[in-house]
Design a protein with these regions (language model features):
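Glycine-rich phosphate-binding "P-loop"
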Residues: 1-16
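Catalytic domains of cell-wall/extracellular-matrix polysaccharide-remodeling enzymes
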Residues: 16-67, 188-216
Length: 245
């Protein structure tokens, strides 16, 4: 891996963030959670205080992290904090088999009237050259591989609310269990690509809206927090050398 290439990419990312948000970023979600030992030096040079990586990047670190991925660790030599992605909450959302987006109530991404309807009917709405394209209008929900049932937005919205409650309940129980033996406030790091919400998972923004409201109004066990806020409240953390991720 060319360090200068990595340094240039990080520099561009920091510069772009500052141009958009008007301030320098405090941390970074490394592309595809990729980390190579020594990259934390480059991040520190860029003024970044923390980064997110996959669970094994923390779990396979040396020495082994006392709290697993449920507390950040500091990189030896630089002091840059490393947050490992939580496996359980990631699976609940990202898994193509067990994840929420695959529920039969949700809109089917791969069926679009640009390909489903008769060519003469759809011709005015597709590519000027006559090539069929996705129009964004989708009539079906995720049911079977061939015969699909019609999409019902009200049913999908109810399911999004239900699954937001399920996600919150699981995090509550997860936090209660972890705090019981950690005796330190654990953190559940749950990062998701923005393209999931509204693109692959059409109801994703609704689910996220329900989840945030439920966490704020419906319980008192967990709360939303950023990595920066967690580090300010919990500055004492283990020092390790993260593994390749």
């Amino acid at each position: 891996i060319c360090r200068e290439s990595v340094r240039a990419q990080v520099k561009v990312a920091v510069s772009h963030y500052e141009a958009v948000f008007g301030r320098k970023p405090r941390g970074i979600w490394l592309p595809e959670c990729g980390y190579h030992p020594g990259h934390d030096e480059i991040l520190k040079e860029a003024g970044l205080r923390y980064f997110l990586t996959d669970a094994h990047g923390v779990l396979h670190g040396a020495p082994r992290p006392k709290y697993g991925c449920f507390a950040p660790v500091y990189c030896r030599g630089t002091g840059v904090a490393c947050f490992g992605r939580d496996l359980d909450s990631s699976k609940q959302v990202w898994s193509s088999i067990d994840g929420y987006p695959g529920d039969y109530s949700y809109r089917e991404f791969y069926r679009d009237i640009g390909f489903d309807l008769d060519y003469d009917y759809i011709r005015p709405y597709i590519h000027p050259d006559g090539v069929r394209i996705n129009t964004g209008i989708k009539y079906y929900r995720i049911t079977g591989s061939d015969n699909k049932e019609s999409y019902n937005p009200h049913l999908a919205r109810e399911k999004a609310a239900q699954q937001a409650g399920n996600f919150m309940f699981n995090r509550e129980k997860q936090i209660e269990y972890l705090y019981g033996f950690m005796q330190k406030k654990p953190i559940i790091v749950s990062p998701y690509d923005a393209e999931l919400f509204g693109h692959w998972w059409y109801e994703g923004p609704q689910w996220l809206d329900f989840l945030i409201r439920k966490i704020i109004f419906d319980q008192k066990t967990i709360r939303l927090i950023t990595p920066t806020e967690y580090l300010l409240e919990n500055p004492r953390n283990q020092v390790i050398t993260p593994s390749l991720s």
